[in-house]
Amino acid sequence: MRRPLFLALSAAAALAMAAVPATSALPAATAAAAAGPCATVTTAPTYTHVIWILMENHSFSDIIGNTAQAPYINGLASECGLATNYHNISHPSLPNYIAMTSGLSGRAIKPFDSDCSPSKKCSTSAPSIFGQGETWKAYDESMPSNCAPANSGEYAVRHNPPPYYTTLAGCSSLDVPYTQLATDLAGSNSLPAFSFITPNLINDMHDGTIAQGDTWLSQNVPAILGSSAYTSGTLAVFITWDEGSGGYPVENCAAKTSDASCHVATIVVSPSTPAGTTSGTLFNHYSLLGTAEQLLGLPRLGQASSYPTMTSAFHL
């Protein structure tokens, strides 16, 4: 397994994190973010920015309560919000990425069951959350060039939805390598309304360990929460997993509560989410889509209108 490179870490920080290496493309977090990111306001503001961070292939029970391997994730869940009855849509990865960004279901996501690369048979002309009237970007760690349509090293195109949408305008300029996020966070108005963040295969826990993914999040999420978009109260962040572990046969997971491979953790981080909030409401990736659409004033796509959003449960 290759060691990810550190970007601009100080010598002291590098020594402290050497046991579990991870890549950070972001500037150091501010002291304000380190003090606790949630419950900084009592009234939900008007959110104009939403960030999703997609991790890979671990069930709820793999992550929540696993403080030995995932101390940062569990700490963030206790400081902010945790959906305890949240489900992926299917297996394997790609149907979930397409479903959560388009609202497609059933036969419409079946062409993606093989985790195929974009092609005539493995694509869709359906609308997606990307470019529904809002600004957007997808930030993909280790992607060699914008809107890359093929796997390369630790970049997996199946974890990057935009290249699969044939009618989507802007993929060549808005589906970008992850390093661009640092620049967009630093700018006064450069962070888009909707951001989709995909760590590489090591840091998203697909090929790497839970501990490596946790360390990556611990190095990157605090900088997001220290950005002006978050500290000004306009940004909500959602961390979720594409699917649970061990669920290789294709199945309908959206409302299947009996299968651990359909049950994943989802953490909600926002200034208006009370610390320690949990919700046992049945949510899934369609709920996440509907939540982003509701916050950003976008039309509901497909199955996003069939499931409850997370706004009320997490005081968004």
Spans of model-derived segments:
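N-terminal secretory signal peptides that target proteins for export/translocation
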Residues: 1-2
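C-terminal region of N-terminal signal peptides and the immediate post-cleavage residues
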Residues: 5-7, 15-37
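Flexible, surface-exposed loop/gating regions in the mature catalytic domains
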Residues: 27, 33-316
